[in-house]
Amino acid sequence: MTTYSDKGAKPERGRFLHFHSVTFWVGNAKQATSFYCSKMGFEPLAYRGLETGSREVVSHVIKQGKIVFVLSSALNPWNKEMGDHLVKHGDGVKDIAFEVEDCDYIVQKARERGAKIMREPWVEQDKFGKVKFAVLQTYGDTTHTLVEKMNYIGQFLPGYEAPAFMDPLLPKLPKCSLEMIDHIVGNQPDQEMVSASEWYLKNLQFHRFWSVDDTQVHTEYSSLRSIVVANYEESIKMPINEPAPGKKKSQIQEYVDYNGGAGVQHIALKTEDIITAIRHLRERGLEFLSVPSTYYKQLREKLKTAKIKVKENIDALEELKILVDYDEKGYLLQIFTKPVQDRPTLFLEVIQRHNHQGFGAGNFNSLFKAFEEEQNLRGNLTNMETNGVVPGM
């Protein structure tokens, strides 16, 4: 595990502020919205569809804390772009939007360095003000929308209206207290991690924040490599993974196979009270990966000689299957959902940090074993020579 302290020169202009929103392209946005609201504690924020004059695409916007998800679907059978995306990738993340300052400058610099500009800067406005946008191509079919608010005071963005329907079930469910996006992870095919991470360094002036390789993260069967990139202020963190050769197909390779290439593997959501959050998410019916009781037996032994003290009750962490990683300065608590669609692709993480800025490297081996158990149930913990071939295709 390597942590990098050199952030490079501070960009002259074009500051990246934070994650703005994540857009999912799904087959049925209305039903996907219901899942994230009922299972995960999101609430409707805004809507754009036929009733608001949007004739091609419907979008339901949901929010929890500072986390904003946009669930979008095609309205017409001739929408080839969204149709092809769904056939290839299934339901998943299409766009990660960043709120920025000086969108024009960022686009100009990215273009000079060779980035593919999917859509040049444009401005939209309504009675609440103006917003400038631009769209850049990153790994796979994923895009980044740059969002520059020009004194905009609306709830979301121009063109969206308040949702017409509020599900009466939602206020009766326990609060989940998820507060903000901590990081968003992209999986790459083998040998593409470095080029994908370098894209951010070159085009967006991000820097390397953290990395691990397959000598540090491996099981008997599989392994991974990961590089985390971040903006100068380190308010946006983007881990980039790739599979590493092993005896069996890794969970990263399984993702790449079923996603049809690179894409967003998971979104980590930060909380200040993970025990309450996970208890309530489990009560709502969200499914999580399980880890064996031996993990907690070993954890109790290791913590006896650790320089830090975990404030949370270890029995409660074991009951909820929450993982702990730590160093001499602090610790983090984390847990991962099972895939949130039928394809074994996108899943979510809930994380709580106590003076610890890592990504759970100490848990990677335990997690990989948990992932491998799930892979085995799906018939996908196969020999490496079958890599790249999705069963039945």
From Swiss-Prot:
Reactions it catalyzes: 3-(4-hydroxyphenyl)pyruvate + O2 = homogentisate + CO2
Signal peptide: none
Species this chain originates from: Homo sapiens (Human)
Membership in a protein family: Belongs to the 4HPPD family.
SUPFAM superfamilies with a match to the protein in the record: Glyoxalase/Bleomycin resistance protein/Dihydroxybiphenyl dioxygenase (SSF54593)
Top-level division of the source organism's lineage: Eukaryota
Protein name: 4-hydroxyphenylpyruvate dioxygenase
Stretches assigned to the VOC domain: 18-149, 180-338
Modified residues annotated as N6-succinyllysine in this record: K132
